[in-house]
């Protein structure tokens, strides 16, 4: 019994399907018997075809800054009414909707005006939804490459204003009218990008008179998108490494000159920065329209490192000066030994002028310059036998020479220590200056734009 009932139900469903298919086949045959897809679907020639256009943005695929091309995945919804494709559902088994290839019916010749790859037309490989009232809904998916003027002045903290302009290619406003479905594109199914954020989006309808046809307007719908770049990737991979290179450059002046590694560290930083710039150059838009912020900062970092190398050479040269090659000018001693250490609180630094005076030598305590000539018997009543000895006198002269030589060496060492002290003061000054310039330079390049972006939000 159950088996018989199941067979009857199956036969009933199969028969309904056959009859339904038969109704749809008959309907399509009747609709397209005398249908001409080239002719506009209007009652009279003066009537206008009204097309409602809606854009649904699915994905922002790519923004090519170099070629100024934006690739997007969209669905372009188009609705219009075809007076030649109406029917009475009661005559066709209650069929109210059918799906037919878009190439079999008349469709508006909408194109993307600012197309960048030469493929202006919309693909017709999808089907349309046709209702018994003659209303047609066509939502073909498409990947468009549109031209967008990319302004890289504030890269990577930049915003781009891009647009997509859709309009008919041959029908003027007297034959075909296009209206936007709403004042904004549909982003309900938009897949967020890891590099860009959709900050604002709108659409406008324009009536344009072209020079070829000045008497009749052509309509277009333009969708505007404001794209804001997400700068985290560039902050982590470009800006922070450049900032660390700058700080490392400043630390060159914290390294003692006697270590002999100042130039080694400076050259190593320069080589590392050069290799780093070669690696990240592909991340920066290669355009000559403007110098991006990140390009300015990289140039600042390069100049910063080169300046540190030049100044390091001067500091090392100052450190190794001696009285035999350079005489310290009074103003240098006044500024770098007496004035600046007090201003910069170098109270714990041992200065050459504060060193203990060496104890007097035998030659300084004993004036032997009068030991010359002959001593008469009337001068003294007693004369030491040692003074009569020429060897003793020669020894005293030798001691005097040694004392003068030691004094000259002490003065030379003191002058060398003064030059080293000047070099050390320069190192401390330059350390503070370079660290300050590093911070101020970074803020000067990026702070203004970041504040402006926060104010806009």
UniProtKB/Swiss-Prot annotation:
Give the matching Gene3D superfamilies: Neurotransmitter-gated ion-channel ligand-binding domain, Neurotransmitter-gated ion-channel transmembrane domain
**Where are its TM segments located?**
231-255, 263-281, 297-316, 429-447
* UniProt-annotated glycosylation sites, renumbered to this chain: 161
Q: Where in the cell is it found?
A: Postsynaptic cell membrane; Cell membrane
Q: Which residues are connected by disulfide bridges in this protein?
A: 148-162, 212-213
Kindly give the InterPro entries that the UniProt entry links to this protein: Neur_chan_lig-bd, Neur_chan_lig-bd_sf, Neur_channel, Neuro-gated_channel_TM_sf, Neuro_actylchol_rec, Neurotrans-gated_channel_TM, Neurotransmitter_ion_chnl_CS, Nicotinic_acetylcholine_rcpt
Protein function: Upon acetylcholine binding, the AChR responds by an extensive change in conformation that affects all subunits and leads to opening of an ion-conducting channel across the plasma membrane.
- Share what the entry says about its subunit structure, partners included: One of the alpha chains that assemble within the acetylcholine receptor, a pentamer of two alpha chains, a beta, a delta, and a gamma or epsilon chains.
Protein name (database record): Acetylcholine receptor subunit alpha-1-B
Q: Which organism is it from?
A: Xenopus laevis
């Amino acid at each position: 019994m159950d088996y018989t009932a199941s067979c009857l139900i199956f036969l009933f469903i199969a028969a309904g399907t056959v009859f339904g298919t038969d109704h749809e086949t008959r309907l399509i045959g009747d609709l397209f018997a005398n249908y001409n897809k080239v002719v506009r679907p209007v009652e009279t020639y003066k009537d206008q075809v009204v097309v409602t256009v809606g854009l649904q943005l699915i994905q922002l695929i790519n923004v090519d800054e170099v070629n100024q091309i934006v690739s997007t995945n969209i669905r372009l919804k188009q609705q219009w009414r075809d007076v030649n494709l109406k029917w009475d559902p009661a005559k066709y088994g209650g069929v109210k909707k059918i799906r037919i290839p878009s190439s079999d019916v008349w469709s508006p010749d909408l194109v993307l005006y600012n197309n960048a790859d030469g493929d202006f037309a919309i693909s017709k490989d999808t089907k349309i939804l046709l209702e018994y009232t003659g209303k047609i809904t066509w939502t073909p998916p498409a990947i468009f490459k549109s031209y967008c003027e990319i302004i890289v002045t504030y890269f990577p903290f930049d915003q781009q204003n891009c647009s997509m302009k859709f309009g008919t290619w041959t029908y003027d406003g007297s034959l075909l009218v296009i209206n936007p479905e709403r004042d904004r594109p549909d982003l309900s199914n938009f897949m967020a990008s890891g590099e860009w954020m959709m900050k604002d989006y709108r659409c406008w309808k324009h009536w344009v008179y072209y020079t070829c046809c000045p008497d009749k307007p052509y309509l277009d719908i333009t969708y505007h998108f404001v794209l804001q770049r997400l700068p985290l990737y560039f902050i982590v991979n470009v800006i922070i490494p450049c900032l660390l290179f700058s700080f490392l450059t400043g630390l060159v002046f914290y390294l003692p000159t006697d270590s002999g590694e100042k130039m080694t560290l400076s050259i190593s930083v320069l080589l590392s920065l050069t290799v780093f710039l070669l690696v990240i150059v592909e991340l920066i838009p290669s355009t000559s329209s403007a110098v991006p912020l990140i390009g300015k900062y990289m140039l600042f970092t390069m100049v910063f490192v080169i300046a540190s190398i030049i100044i390091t050479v001067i500091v090392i040269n100052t450190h190794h000066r001696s009285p035999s090659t350079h005489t310290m000018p009074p103003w240098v001693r006044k500024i770098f030994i007496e004035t600046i250490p007090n201003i910069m609180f170098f109270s714990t630094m041992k200065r050459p002028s504060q060193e203990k005076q060496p104890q007097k030598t035998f030659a300084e305590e004993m004036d032997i310059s009068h030991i010359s000539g002959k001593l008469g018997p009337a001068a003294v009543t007693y004369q030491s036998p040692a003074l009569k000895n020429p060897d003793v006198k020669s020894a005293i002269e030798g001691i005097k020479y040694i004392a003068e030589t030691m004094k000259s060496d002490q003065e030379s060492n003191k002058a060398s220590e003064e030059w080293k002290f000047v070099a050390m003061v320069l190192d401390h000054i330059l350390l503070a200056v370079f660290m300050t310039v590093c911070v101020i330079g970074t803020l000067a390049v990026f702070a203004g734009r970041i504040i402006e972006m926060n104010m806009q939000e």
